[in-house]
Every structure is written in structure tokens, then in C-alpha cells.
Amino acid sequence: MDNFIYGDVYSRGKLTDKQRELLTITALTASQTLDSLPAQVQAALEAGATPVEIKETLYQCAPYVGFPKTVGALEITNKVFKKQGIKMPLANQST
């Protein structure tokens, strides 16, 4: 399975690693596969996603997958940020 996901899927197409990780975070949130989320949040940071971009990705999930699912993902993401020394709360963004 890992070979399919990380070999075949990740090596195809025009998406950047950052874009792939943000999409993976979205899919994990929507499917409530939250046990895999910490590793993917970390991978997104390593791929160049900013904490704000990761949070915005999750905020965009709320109207489509529901607020309760999004809150769980945000709580996990905040734990990853804290472990990485990322100060919370993040600066306000205008949207």
C-alpha cells in the first residue's frame, strides 16, 4: 500500500508536494481518518506549507464536511504545532 501511495500516486502529476499534503489533510479530515493526520500535518510543514495555510485548508473543510469533523482536525493540528514550537494563536488573517 505504501508503494502505491508514495510511489505511484505521489510521483504523478503537476501538483507540488505542498499541494499534495494540503489535499491529503483535507481528505483525512473529510473521512475522519484522524490517526494519520499528525504525520500529514508535519509532512505539510516540511513541504513548505505555513501554519496559516494548513489552518485555512481546515477552515475550508467546515462548510462541506461539518464543523464537528473540522474541530477534531483543528485540535490535532494545534497539538502538532505546539510540539513544533509554533506559537498559538496564529495571527489573524483577513479573508
Show the residue positions of the predicted features.
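Acidic, glycine/proline-rich low-complexity segments that act as flexible tails and inter-domain linkers
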Residues: 1-18, 41-42, 46, 70-95
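Short, structured motif recognition centered on aromatic/hydrophobic residues
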Residues: 20-28, 57-58
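Short amphipathic alpha-helical segments at helix boundaries and their inter-helical linkers
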Residues: 29, 33-42, 61-76
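Short, charged low-complexity intrinsically disordered segments located at boundaries
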Residues: 32-33, 54-59, 88-93
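Mid-chain, well-packed structural core segment of small domains
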Residues: 35-55
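Generic hydrophobic/packing signal
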Residues: 49, 58-61, 65, 81
